[in-house]
Amino acid sequence: MTSVLLTRPLTQVAALEALVTNSGHQPLLFPTLEIQALKAKVKCKHYDAVIFISANAVEFGLEILKKITYSAIFTVGVATAKKLNDYHIEVDDFPKKNPSSEALLALDSVSCLRDKKILIFRGRGGRETLRIGFEKNDNTVEYAQVYDRVICSLSEQHQKSLDVFLSGSKGFVSVTSNENLDGLIVLAKQTGQLDSIKNYPLIVLSARTKSYAQTCGFQQIIVTPDISDQAIASVLE
């Protein structure tokens, strides 16, 4: 049985854990990040466009969204759009393939925005691609930073999962973002096992994370066909 080291936050890993188990592999939980809510305030009551960066942004930004009005709502990808749909909120548009800030900016429905007030729901920090892109068209951009990603403290669970994982000659490591990978590196360094982990294939969700992983010294990297949990499970076969 092949082991799969799952680095998602514990609150978000259950579905992927079940898929890995059902595919005949052994999931090992190694959460690298905790998602913590931030108190955010917005300046306006109405925005021409509202954008959600991630499913976490939806989860933690929903209360603010209920208190404002907006003309259009966009997401960076299908998973975030689905999260809004789960709350019966209709999304106007999102990139259907290769979800990214660049792909969102390239949409006809988004590139036409000019002289508009735009609110972006996101986590603390992150890339400035959207802000820069929108400001080129004289839009006013505001952030609602509604959550933070904090690297987990090393626990007995981490050590136990890692010991089981490294005892096998075959295995995969699944990471879902650059920040997720940063957390893995920090925790692996604390255990003294980073070089050992780099001997195993790393499963990532995008070419951007692949490039970042390469700069971090990972060489065996598999990019999933899309960002779904099913896509992660499919590359294990």
Give residue spans per PLM region.
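Signature of uroporphyrinogen-III synthase
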Residues: 1-237
